[in-house]
Amino acid sequence: MREKIRLVSSAKTGHFYTTTKNKRLHPEKIEIKKFDPVVRKHVVYKEAKIK
């Protein structure tokens, strides 16, 4: 089953994206480069739990 996750910016701006992932096939945490509109740069986003 796909679970909702939150991708939090490593630039400490508080910006985040939400997405889903299949935890059975990919149990490791996601790290992906995406655009952060607050600092207007591409930064690494790391997986975090949705509260």
UniProtKB/Swiss-Prot annotation:
One GO molecular-function entry: structural constituent of ribosome
GO cellular component terms listed in the entry, alphabetical order = cytosolic large ribosomal subunit
Gene designation per UniProt: rpmG
Q: Which InterPro entries match?
A: Ribosomal_bL33 (IPR001705), Ribosomal_bL33_CS (IPR018264), Ribosomal_bL33_sf (IPR038584), Ribosomal_zn-bd (IPR011332)
What UniProt keywords are attached to this protein's entry?
Ribonucleoprotein, Ribosomal protein
Family per record: Belongs to the bacterial ribosomal protein bL33 family.
What PANTHER family is this protein classified in? 54S RIBOSOMAL PROTEIN L39, MITOCHONDRIAL, LARGE RIBOSOMAL SUBUNIT PROTEIN BL33M
According to its UniProt entry, the protein's GO biological process terms are: translation
Q: Which organism is it from?
A: Ruthia magnifica subsp. Calyptogena magnifica
Keyword check for tRNA-binding: no
Provide the protein name: Large ribosomal subunit protein bL33
